[in-house]
Amino acid sequence: MSKYSVLLPTYNERKNLPIITYLIAKTFDQEKLDWEIVIIDDASPDGTQEVAKELQKIYGEDKILLKPRSGKLGLGTAYIHGLKFATGDFVIIMDADFSHHPKYLPEFIKLQKEHNYDIVLGTRYAKDGGVYGWNLKRKFISRGANLLASTVLGTGVSDVTGSFRLYKKPVLETLMSEVTSKGYVFQMEIIARAREHNYTIGEVPIAFVDRLYGESKLGMDDILGYLKGVFSLLFI
């Protein structure tokens, strides 16, 4: 039986973590699949790590792995850190704030099995996908950014910046060893490099919902950094 490792980066997710963990565990147990969750916490001051330790008591330390870091060191490096401890055949990355609902996990897994895909992406921009909780400006920026990146880089996928994905573990290990970007460009570079390797990619339409608790911000610096990143990836 294949095993699935979920990498869950956290920062101030005390309120969300118990619910998202319950739903992930419930989904895998209903599908009769072997699983683990690797929680990578960046020194959250709100008690996220204490909540994670309580979850270990409930589900077991073999199911909930807490691998904290000393501070906010970036999303990309969080995945790299968490991957060191993942023991699954497949690795799933997703957000802990309910932007990505665990109900889609069976669809990811089914699609991967049917086509033996190296990567399965959750896409907001294919048929039946969508974004909820964002204002029109942010929707426009996100959609435009994805169209720009997919056109310029020729990725062949509809959502290059989403962070709800399933990977064959060796594939992710290869990509992580090569990626150099940080921030919003990180996910995009992963896909660009995947295409260089001719890895196969499938897509599952998802409804992306803005975070349940806490704040989500997108500033001009993020936008400018993204544009710079798109064109820098032309030369990888």
Curated annotation (Swiss-Prot):
Keyword GTP-binding carried by entry: no
Cofactors named for this entry: Mg(2+); Mn(2+); Ca(2+)
Reactions this protein catalyses: a di-trans,poly-cis-dolichyl phosphate + GDP-alpha-D-mannose = a di-trans,poly-cis-dolichyl beta-D-mannosyl phosphate + GDP
Entry binding sites for Mn(2+): D97
Location in or out of the cell: Endoplasmic reticulum
Sorted UniProt keywords: Endoplasmic reticulum, Glycosyltransferase, Magnesium, Manganese, Metal-binding, Transferase
Major location category of this protein: endoplasmic reticulum
EC number, UniProt record: 2.4.1.83
Membrane-crossing segments per the record: none
Binding site for Mg(2+): D97
Top class in the EC scheme: transferase
A GO CC term attached to the entry: endoplasmic reticulum
SUPFAM superfamilies: Nucleotide-diphospho-sugar transferases
Pathway annotation: Protein modification; protein glycosylation
Binding residues annotated for GDP-alpha-D-mannose, in chain numbering: P9, Y11, E13, I40, D42, D95, A96, D97, R124, V160, R211, K217
Cofactor note: Binds 1 divalent metal cation.
Gene Ontology process terms (BP): dolichol phosphate mannose biosynthetic process; dolichol-linked oligosaccharide biosynthetic process; GPI anchor biosynthetic process; protein O-linked mannosylation
GO molecular function annotations of the record: dolichyl-phosphate beta-D-mannosyltransferase activity; metal ion binding
Stated family: Belongs to the glycosyltransferase 2 family.
Subunit structure: Component of the dolichol-phosphate mannose (DPM) synthase complex composed of dpm1, dpm2 and dpm3.
Role according to the record: Transfers mannose from GDP-mannose to dolichol monophosphate to form dolichol phosphate mannose (Dol-P-Man) which is the mannosyl donor in pathways leading to N-glycosylation, glycosyl phosphatidylinositol membrane anchoring, and O-mannosylation of proteins.
Name of the protein described by the UniProt record: Dolichol-phosphate mannosyltransferase
Gene source species: Schizosaccharomyces pombe (strain 972 / ATCC 24843)
